[in-house]
């Protein structure tokens, strides 16, 4: 039973890391898209 808390924390860390990575990629893509639009104007 001592394994479950560490596993829970591990999964929470993985999830938060994935969310942070996803947000970072979304921001980078948005910035590049905005840059393209501004250059085409």
Curated annotation (Swiss-Prot):
Source taxonomy: Bacteria, Bacillati, Cyanobacteriota, Cyanophyceae, Acaryochloridales
Record flagged with keyword Oxidoreductase: no
An individual GO BP term: photosynthesis
Main location: membrane
Lumenal topological segments: 2-6
Subunit structure and binding partners: PSII is composed of 1 copy each of membrane proteins PsbA, PsbB, PsbC, PsbD, PsbE, PsbF, PsbH, PsbI, PsbJ, PsbK, PsbL, PsbM, PsbT, PsbX, PsbY, PsbZ, Psb30/Ycf12, peripheral proteins PsbO, CyanoQ (PsbQ), PsbU, PsbV and a large number of cofactors. It forms dimeric complexes. Part of a photosystem II (PSII) assembly intermediate complex PSII-I; crystallized from a strain deleted of psbJ, it forms monomeric PSII before addition of the oxygen evolving complex. PSII-I includes 3 assembly factors not found in mature PSII (Psb27, Psb28 and Psb34).
Cytoplasmic face of the membrane: 30-41
Domain of life: Bacteria
A GO CC term attached to the entry: photosystem II
A Pfam short name: PsbX
InterPro entries named among the record's database cross-references: PSII_PsbX (IPR009518), PSII_PsbX_type_1_subfam (IPR023431)
Entries under HAMAP family matching the protein: PSII_PsbX_1
Protein name as annotated: Photosystem II reaction center protein X
Source organism (scientific name): Thermosynechococcus vestitus (strain NIES-2133 / IAM M-273 / BP-1)
Protein's job: Involved in the binding and/or turnover of quinones at the Q(B) site of photosystem II (PSII). PSII is a light-driven water plastoquinone oxidoreductase, using light energy to abstract electrons from H(2)O, generating a proton gradient subsequently used for ATP formation.
UniProt keyword Lyase present: no
Topology in the lipid bilayer: Single-pass membrane protein
Cell location: Cellular thylakoid membrane
């Amino acid at each position: 039973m001592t394994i479950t808390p560490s596993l829970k924390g591990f999964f929470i860390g993985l999830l938060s890391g994935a969310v942070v990575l996803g947000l970072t990629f979304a921001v980078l893509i948005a910035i590049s898209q905005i840059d393209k639009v501004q250059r085409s104007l």
